[in-house]
Amino acid sequence: MSAKKRPSGNAAFELPKRRRTYQACISCRSRKVKCDLGPVDNPHDPPCARCKRELKKCIFSSNKGTSNDLPPNSINAISLPSLGKSKQEIQNDSTSPILSDVPLSRKGISSEKSFKSEGMKWKLELSSMQNALEFLAQAAGTVAKEGAKEIIKEKSTTPKPLKSSLDATNKSATDEGLKRLSKSDSTNTLYENTADMLNHTLNTNRKTSQLMEEIGKVRPPPTRKIDDFDYIGPDSLLTKEEAIELIEAFFLTMHPFFPNIPLQLHDPKELAEYPILFCAILTVSARYHPFDTLGLDNGEDGMRHIEVHDKLWVYCQKLISQTIWAEASTRSIGTVLAFIIFTEWNPRSIHYKWSDYANDPELNNVNARGSKNISTRKDEEGLTGVGAIRRSDRMSWMLTGSAVRLAQDMGFIENSSKVFIVTHISETTSAMNMNQRSLLAESFSVLNLNLGKIENDGNESNEDYLGNEKFYLNEILPDEESKLRWKRVFENSENDHDNEKNFLTDWEREFLNDEYVLYYSNKKDDTNLAQNHIPPFPLRFSFAQRAKIEIIRILSIAYETIYCEKNKRKLATTDQRHNLSVLSVFSPLIEGWLSNYRELLVPLSDVPFSLADRKNKKQIFDNIDRINGESIITDFNYCQLYIFSLALQVDGKTSRLNMNEIVTSARYVELAYRSAKEILSSAKRVSRQGMLKYMPVRWVIRIIRSIAFIVKCYLTLTGSELATNPDARNILKLSAISVDETFDIIRDTAVTLKEATPDELHLCQRYAAILMYLCTEMKLRKKSYLERPPLLRDGTTPLESNRESSLEGQDLTKKPIFSKRIGYNKTETTFEPSERPLTEEINSNSQNSNDTSSKGIVDPFVEQNNDITTALLNNELFQGPSLSDEVTDWFGASEDIGLEFVEPWTELIEQRYMQCGDGDNNNFENLYNLFVNSNNINNDINNSRPITRK
C-alpha cells in the first residue's frame, strides 16, 4: 500500500502519473494508434516503437499549450538537475517551425491577430484549379524554405555517439527548450520570437510571389523586329521591303473581306510581335499578289510569288504544330486570328495530297524534311473542286475549334468585339459545312446586342453611350505609347469625328477596344484566368457588327432546325405543308432584321481601285466600308437562300398541294431565287472593281450554291413532265423565273469566276470550267425548249401557259400576289392585300422593271441577250451530247432538302466533266474567250446603269 501513498513534500514538484507526459508522433496520431516511447516516467528517445518497426521518420508536433499554463515552480522544478530527463526536452527537441503551433503568451495575442489579418494575403479562394495550384505553390515555397533551414541546422550539428542515458543524448535540446520556457523569457522574448517568425513567414510568401514573377520574366515578351525572322533578309526568302509590301497589299485588298484584325496591327512593326499572324498574312498575300503587280521582282518565270507562298506555308505548319503544347508565347490574339485567316483563304496545298509523317518515311528525318523540294508536289494529281472543298471544310473545322478554345481560355471573346464576331461566324459556318454541332451555339441564346442605336445626349458621362470607352479613355490614352499608336492609326485617315459633340466613331471605338486587348488585359501575366480581364461594361458592338451577328444567329437557328441531323433535331421533311409551317416561323425573323439594318445594304459604288493606294490609310478605310456593305448584302441574301430554298422540296409521291399552298411556296421560292441572283450580282459588282480575286473561300462557296440553286430551277422548268414533279413545276412557273435569264446568269457567272481566279489551282478556276461545261451540255435542252410555243416557255406568262394544268378554274385574283414599290434605289417586295410576311428586298439591277402581278421581274438586258444566246448555241464548240438523264433527273429522285443537293450534284457534274475530256485547257480557253466576247455586251449594258452609293 506504501506504493500508493502520495509523494512527500520533497517530491511535490513531480507530476501526477495519470497525466500524459508526452505526445504521440504525427504518424501514430494519423492512424489513431498508441505511440510507444517506453515507460511514462522514463520515455526513451524517438523514434517510437511503431515508427522504428516500419522504418518511418518519427516526427512530433509542438505542444498545444502555452507557457503560462504551467506554474512557475513547475518550470523551475523541471530545470532541477535531479529530474534530468524530462518529457519537455523531448517536446522541445521535436518542435516544428510551423507558425500555427507556436505557443503564444497573453501579451502576444495582438501579434496573433496581426498575423491573421496579414496572412490572409496569400490565403487564396480555391474557386478553380489554377487558384488551388497557386495556393500549393506558395505553401510549398514556405515549407521548402523551412526544410532547407532544418537541413542546414542538421548539417551544422556535430554528431555525437549514441548513449544509453537520455540525459547525455538530449542535453542540448533540453537546454534550448528551457531557455524558451523560462519565466523571464515567457513574455518579451516569446513575443519577439513570434514576431520574427511572423515576419519571416510573410516575407517568405512575398519572396515566393516575387519568385513566380521572376520565373515569368525569365522569358520576357519578345520585342521582335521584321529583320529578326529567319525568312526575311537580303539573302533570305524575302527582303524586308518585300514583306512590308505584301502586308500593306493584304490590308488593302483582302482585309476588307475580313475586317477583324486590330487596327494597331496594320503597322508591320507592331504585327511583327505576333510571329504566327505575321507569317500567315505573308503566306496568303503571296498567293494572291504576284510580285510584279507590286513593283517587285517575280522571277524569270513569273512564279516567284508561288514559291514564296509554298515555302511560307511549310513554315506556318511548323508554327501551328507548336501551338498545341499551350506554350505561353503562342497564347495570343495573333494565334487566334492566324487560324481564322487560313480558314478564309486556303493555301495552295489544299488541292494536293501532301506527304506527312504518316505516309512519307523521309519526313521522319528533320533534315530531309527541311530540304524536301516543294515544287515536286505540283506534278502529283490534284484534288478536284469538290474534294478540295471537303478538305477545306475539315481544315477549317479543326483550326476554328483550336481558335475558339484559345479565345475562350484567354478571354478574347468576352473582351474583343472583333474576336467575338470572327469566332462566331467562322465556327458556325464550319459547323454547318461539317454538319456538326456548333461550339458557340449556346452563346447566341444569352447574347444581348442592345439593338437600339447609340445616341449621345451631349453628356460625356452618359454610360449608355460611352460604356467601356470611358474606361478606356481614362485608363489607356494617358499612356504615351497608346497616344503614339492612336496618332499613327488615324493620321491622314480623315476620320469623320464630330469634335463639337465628342462623338466616338466606330473606328475609334474599335481602336480603344483593340488597345485594351492587345496591351492591357494580358500584359502582366498571360497565365491569368479569362475572368480576371473582363472589362467593367459589356462589349459594345458597332451597328454593322450587330447586323452580322444577327444574321449568323438566324442562320444558326435555321441550321439546327432545318438541316442538322446529328442531334435528330431536323424539322424539315418531305411534307411540304410542314415545311411551309417551318418557313412561316423564319419569315418574321428575316423581315425584322431587314427593318433594323436596311440602311447597311449599300451596293458597291464604281470607285477606281488601284494597288498603288496600299499606303493610303484613307483608301484602306474606304475599301473596308465599301466591301463591308457588299458583305452584308451577301450575308443577308444567303440567309434567305439558305432558308427559303426549302420551299422547292416537294414530294410528288404524297398528296398534291392545293392552290394556296402552291402560291405560298412560290412566294418563298421566288425570294430564294432573287437572293441567289443578288449574290451573283454582288459578285459581279465586286469583280468590276477588280477585287473579286481576293475574296475568301466563304464567298466562293456561296456563289457556287447560288448558281446551283438557279440551275436546279432551270432544269426543273425545262425537264420532261414525266421526270419532274408537277407541283415543283407549278411552283416555279408562279415564281416568275425566266429560262432565258437563267441561262445567261449561268454563263455570266462562269466568266466572272474565271476572271476571279488568282492561280490555276483556285476553286474559281475549277468551278468556272464546270459551269462552262454545263452550258455546253445544256444547249440541246435549250434548243428544244426554245422550239416550244411561246406561251409554253415564256416565264413571264406562267398562268396562261398552264391553262390545262391543275390550276385551271382557280380564281387567282383573290389570292395574295406580288407587287413592287421602287424608291430610294431599293425594290420593296410585298404581298397584298392582307399578307406581308416577308421582306423588302434590295435589288439594284431591277430598278427599271415594271410593276407586275402575273409578269415575272426580268432584268432589261435579258431580251437583248437572246441573239447572244442563239449565237452561242449555234457555235461549233457547243456541238456534243446533251445532259444525261442522270443529271437532269437528279432532282426528281434526290431527297436532299434545301441546299443539301449542291455538293453531291456538283460532284456528279464534275465527274462527267472529267470523263468527257473537256478538261483540256485549250478547249476551256476557247470556251472562255467565246463567253467573254458575248459577255462584253452585258458589261456595256451594266455600265450604262451605274450604281450610286448613298
Swiss-Prot record:
- Please give the function described in this protein's UniProt entry: Transcription activator required for the expression of genes involved in the catabolism of aromatic amino acids such as the aromatic aminotransferase II ARO9 and the phenylpyruvate decarboxylase ARO10.
Q: What else is known?
A: Present with 319 molecules/cell in log phase SD medium.
Q: Where is this region: Disordered?
A: 154-177, 791-810, 830-857
Which species is listed as the source?
Answer: Saccharomyces cerevisiae (strain ATCC 204508 / S288c)
Q: Where is the composition biased (Basic and acidic residues)?
A: 801-810
Q: Which cysteines are joined by disulfide bonds?
A: none
List, in alphabetical order, the GO biological process terms annotated in this UniProt record.
aromatic amino acid family catabolic process; branched-chain amino acid catabolic process; L-phenylalanine catabolic process; L-tryptophan catabolic process; positive regulation of transcription by RNA polymerase II; tyrosine catabolic process
InterPro entries, per the entry: AAA_Catabolism_Regulators (IPR052780), Zn2-C6_fun-type_DNA-bd_sf (IPR036864), Zn2Cys6_DnaBD (IPR001138)
The answer to whether keyword Transcription applies is yes
* Keywords of the record: Branched-chain amino acid catabolism, DNA-binding, Metal-binding, Nucleus, Phenylalanine catabolism, Transcription, Transcription regulation, Tryptophan catabolism, Tyrosine catabolism, Zinc
One Pfam short name: Zn_clus
Q: Which residues bind DNA?
A: 25-58
GO MF term set: DNA-binding transcription factor activity, RNA polymerase II-specific; sequence-specific DNA binding; zinc ion binding
**CC annotations in GO:** nucleus
Protein location: Nucleus
**Ranges of Low complexity composition bias in the record:** 843-854
* Name of the protein in its database record: Transcriptional activator ARO80
